[in-house]
């Protein structure tokens, strides 16, 4: 059974249709939107600030989502896919974004919609990703604009697939 823990008078709010894996941890000031999925060994820790997760978000195995005390919340839009073992910290990820496996997203990063962050990329503090961009590398840099079919076949398709996987578990 997942660990859902209140802290500092804040209790996580889990909306309808959400899947939480048996060993997922959700703590504190967290909202998880409808039809989202939080997979195995994931920690979402809203103990020092707020974490707001939109609808149809998939947070894959081993991901850590956190924020910074008195400084940065973490806000994740709708239809976002966060790949296995990524670290999401004190940033804003807008709608229809794919975060690759093992990527690290640091404080005050803003990722606009319809963007892809490559596996293993490190977005350092304050990086701004404009809509429709591919960022990769350490530190991550703009590589190119995405093609419409990449948005459809990578970002949208991954989010749709995880909604299907969610149905197998709920």
Question: Where are each of the predicted segments found?
Answer:
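Glycine-rich hexapeptide-repeat left-handed beta-helix
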Residues: 1-13, 47, 53-55, 61-62, ...
């Amino acid at each position: 059974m997942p660990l859902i823990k209140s802290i500092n008078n804040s209790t996580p709010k889990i909306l309808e249709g959400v899947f939480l894996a048996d060993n997922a941890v959700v703590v504190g000031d967290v909202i998880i939107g409808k039809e989202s999925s939080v997979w195995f060994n994931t920690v979402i820790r809203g103990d020092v600030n707020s974490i707001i997760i939109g609808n149809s978000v998939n947070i894959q195995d081993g991901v850590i989502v956190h924020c910074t005390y008195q400084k940065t919340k973490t806000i994740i839009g709708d239809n976002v896919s966060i790949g296995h073992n990524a670290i999401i910290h004190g940033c804003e990820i807008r709608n229809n974004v794919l975060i690759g496996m093992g990527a690290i997203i640091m404080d005050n990063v803003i990722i606009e919609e319809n963007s892809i962050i490559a596996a293993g990329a490190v977005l350092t503090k304050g990086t701004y990703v404009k809509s429709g961009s591919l960022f990769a590398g350490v530190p991550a840099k703009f590589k190119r604009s995405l093609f419409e079919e990449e948005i459809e076949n990578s970002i949208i398709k991954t989010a749709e697939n995880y909604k299907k996987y969610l149905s197998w578990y709920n």
